[in-house]
Amino acid sequence: PVLQDFSNKGTLWGFVPFVDEQQPTEIPIPITLHIGDYNMDGYPDALVILKNTSGSNQQAFLLENVPCNNASCEEARRMFKVYWELTDLNQIKDAMVATFFDIYEDGILDIVVLSKGYTKNDFAIHTLKNNFEADAYFVKVIVLSGLCSNDCPRKITPFGVNQPGPYIMYTTVDANGYLKNGSAGQLSQSAHLALQLPYNVLGLGRSANFLDHLYVGIPRPSGEKSIRKQEWTAIIPNSQLIVIPYPHNVPRSWSAKLYLTPSNIVLLTAIALIGVCVFILAIIGILHWQEKKADDREKRQEAHRFHFDAM
């Protein structure tokens, strides 16, 4: 079970209870898990606000999605593990809301925390950079609305804004050759300070293989029977895909724009490629220089031979 109390060094931490008052002194925030794959392993992690049950302190904590190791989660085979010793998060006292956001647009989810300020009506925003470094890959997908404010002009594809409700799913092959798939929904909640990501970051783990298939579906009007779904193939890892479902009822006409996300892996690959080219050029230069010296030596020997023959 997720909604349970957690114990750490004799201290009991639990979710902040929702207080329904007639005249609340502060904004009541219901229990909310903000989901995001911070380590790009393909399993959704969570950020939560926990309160010390024996005191008044409440903090933001990271819950990592890990394999199950007890009997309470055998059927799900996964569980959330609380990270208690994250120094930067622990320094933020009286946290109210914590969520994920890709601040640097590099596909790695950072953390944004809203906490109480020095006065009663004052709040502070904290941003924490995710320094996670691993040989992991991702694909970032955002599905737009494909709408115009008025009639859409001809030969111009309308972008619109990100819409709630789309469903994204991919299939690929992992590093061991096994079939792997993953899925996510876009903007499934809008109320109660949901603060969900405006896009979907799907972790691929350590598999650098292309995505064999990526499916995108959008909600259909009530009474319509046709499925609004389109498929794209051979999607490059560490890329961002912007899907424009226009027109909505003709999935074959939907378009997608693919943007590559620069990363350290690309830089290291370029450096390695340049190094190999320089090494090959150095070998070619040395061989050419040796061959030139050998040719000069042969020419001198030929000149001496003709000179002695003339004598």
UniProtKB/Swiss-Prot annotation:
InterPro entries reported for this sequence: Integrin_alpha_N, Tip
Subcellular location: Secreted; Cell membrane
Keyword Protein biosynthesis attached: no
Chief location bin: secreted
Superkingdom per UniProt: Eukaryota
Residue positions with a glycan: N52, N70, N181
An example Gene Ontology CC term for this record: plasma membrane
The entry's keywords: Cell membrane, Glycoprotein, Membrane, Secreted, Transmembrane, Transmembrane helix
Any matching Pfam family: C2_ITFG1
Transmembrane segments: 266-286
Keyword check for Secreted: yes
Membrane topology listed for this record: Single-pass type I membrane protein
Role according to the record: Modulator of T-cell function. Has a protective effect in graft versus host disease model.
Quaternary structure note: Interacts with RUVBL1, RUVBL2 and alpha-tubulin.
Family: Belongs to the TIP family.
Protein name stated in the entry: T-cell immunomodulatory protein
Species annotation: Macaca fascicularis
